[in-house]
Regions:
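Radical SAM enzyme [4Fe-4S]-AdoMet core and its adjacent flexible, acidic
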Residues: 58, 68, 98, 122, ...
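Conserved alpha-helical substructure of the radical SAM core
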Residues: 2-117, 121-122, 328, 332
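Conserved residues at the C-terminal ends of beta-strands
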Residues: 48, 78, 129, 197, ...
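Short, acidic/turn-prone active-site loops that include or flank metal/cofactor-
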Residues: 34, 108-109, 130-134, 321
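Flexible, active-site-proximal loop/turn residues at the rims of small-molecule/cofactor binding pockets
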Residues: 51, 81, 132, 200, ...
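Accessory C-terminal segments flanking Radical SAM cores
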Residues: 231-331
Length: 332
């Protein structure tokens, strides 16, 4: 089974509940950035995400309120670096009590401190950032030794009984051969899930490491072939989309983002505006416009946070797609 059964059943119940209520749009994942403080300055990250003052972090109460307001069954704790957040352990506890499934996204540098304070739980996944093998990952993180630390923390997390997965961004220079080498390593360690995302131009960053549409299609055509050999978390229909074999509208409301600046609209990557309240965010963003991908910043986007929800949203339109997804979830 690709995901734990409770994740699948929670998602199904949430979708059925919203459809019964007649809700056309509803979030499935809360991307919670409790702080913009980080111990790295990775090349794919905008400055505001790693230069924030820890004193400007969200309070524990604000984080819990975001959980309750969005109602999303999945919580992704990102940032910034979440393991720096002083209230991380009680935040995870509060999310578990609300029967959310938590992905703790981390670079791994301070993960051993979290392990000392927390305990494994079926509703908690440790999601370690790994953008390739040693040379590539340390280059992306702009610091030597980060790869070795991440791998050590993956080993330790697994030995302690945590569910550990990884998150990888593919850049222009990244070879698919290296991605497969990384997958071989992670599989040998016992990692059960690997999320792969294309790095693309969405902001005016001083880097040319991001890919455009043609480059994304070429690399993800090869990554699609790897999905039969390794436990890739991306759905097969999303990988076909990233490979240029099918089209989807965006679903920016599927993964909503709460930050120290407010609710980020329209999506995780594009900060057109920050809203002080959930109600203002949910009712003010022009979802129709952003779904159509007409904005210039959306042209090269194949981000899983925008299009995995689209896969689910459009799934009922094809029996073949439903069968593909059923095999992927229950027979792999």
């Amino acid at each position: 089974m690709r995901f734990p059964m409770h994740v699948t059943t929670d998602m199904m119940r949430w979708q059925i509940k919203n459809k019964i209520k007649g809700n056309k749009r509803f979030p499935v994942v809360l991307m919670l950035e409790p702080l913009y403080t980080c111990n790295l300055a990775c090349l794919g990250c905008t400055p505001e995400r790693h230069t924030g003052d820890i004193r400007n972090r969200l309070s524990l109460e604000q984080c819990i309120a975001a959980l309750d307001e969005s109602g999303a069954p999945v919580l992704s704790i990102c940032g910034g670096e979440p393991t720096i957040y002083p209230e991380l352990v009680p935040l995870v506890k509060a999310a578990v009590e609300r029967k959310r499934h938590i992905y703790l996204c981390t670079n791994g540098i301070l993960l051993d401190r979290f392990f000392e304070k927390a305990k494994p739980h079926p509703r908690l996944s440790i999601n370690v950032h790994l953008d390739g093998m040693r040379d590539t990952h340390d280059f992306v993180c702009d610091r030597d030794g980060v790869f070795d630390k991440a791998v050590a923390m993956i080993r330790k997390g697994l030995s302690l009984g945590y569910h550990v997965c990884t998150n990888t961004t593919v850049f222009k220079e990244t070879s698919v051969e290296e991605i497969e080498e990384m997958m071989q390593l992670l599989t040998s360690l016992g990692v059960k899930g690997m999320l792969i995302s294309p790095g693309y131009h969405y902001e005016k960053l001083s880097t040319d490491h991001f890919m455009f549409r043609k480059e994304i299609h070429e690399k993800f055509t090869k990554i699609l072939a790897l999905a039969a050999k390794y436990p890739i978390y991306n759905t097969p229909l999303f990988l076909e989309f990233a490979a240029g074999r099918r089209e989807y509208p965006c679903t920016p409301w599927g993964n909503v983002t709460r930050t120290p600046l407010g609710w980020k609209g329209p999506c995780y990557l594009i900060g057109e505006k920050y809203y002080p309240t959930w109600e203002e965010f949910w009712t003010s963003v022009d979802w129709d416009y952003w779904e159509r991908r007409e904005d210039e910043r959306c042209q090269n986007c194949f981000m899983h946070s925008g299009f995995e929800p689209s896969v689910v949203r459009k799934l009922g339109e094809s029996w073949g797609d439903m069968w593909t997804m059923a095999k992927w979830q229950f027979m792999s």
